[in-house]
Amino acid sequence: MAALKYWVWLTTLPGLTNRSKLLLLEHFPSPEDIYYAQPEDLPPVEGLSSSQAALLSDKSTDRAEDVLARCAKGDIFLLTMQDALYPDRLRNIYDPPVLLYGRGRMPLFDEEAAVSVVGTRTCTPYGISAAEELGYQLAKEGAVVVSGLAKGIDLSLIHISEPTRRVVIS
C-alpha cells in the first residue's frame, strides 16, 4: 500500500500530463524514486519542461491519501503499470494510463472482451441514457467496460458496475 501512495501522488499532481509522467518513469524505477528525487537529481528529460519538473517539488501526499481512502471505501481497485495484471492491450499503446482505477470483479483484461467508451462532455439526456443502456447490456453479456470517466458520456457509465457486477475501468 505504501508504494501505491506514490503512484497516486504522481498521477494526481496538478499540471503534469500523462505523457510527462511516462517520461519520468522512463528515467526513474518507480514513482517513489521520483518523489524522493531532489531537483538536482532530475535528469534533463526530453519533453518535460522546467515548469513541469518544478511541479515535482509538491511533496504533499494528502491528495493521494484521500484518493486511497475513497478507493478503499468504494471498493475500487488500482493497477499500476508495473502490476502483472495491468493489461498488455493498454501497456503497448502510445500513451498508456499510468494508473487504472477499477470497480467490480478484477477481470483477466487480455482474455476478455472489452469495450471502450468515448463521448462528448456535453451530452443530451437521451445520449446519457443510450450510453448507460448500451454499457449495461455489454457488461451484462460479459464485456469489460473501459471509460476515462470524463464529464459527460464517459462518467455516466460508472453506475453500471454495481448492477452488472462487472468491472468499469478508468
Predicted regions, residues:
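Short, glycine/serine-rich, charged loops/turns that create anion-binding
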Residues: T122, A150, V167
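Phosphate/pyrophosphate-binding betaalpha-module
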Residues: G135, A139, A143-S161
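Single conserved hydrophobic/aromatic residue that forms the stacking wall/gate
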Residues: I158-S170
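Residue-level detector of anion-binding/catalytic polar loops
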Residues: F77, V144, R166
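Short, positively charged patches
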Residues: M1-Y136, K140
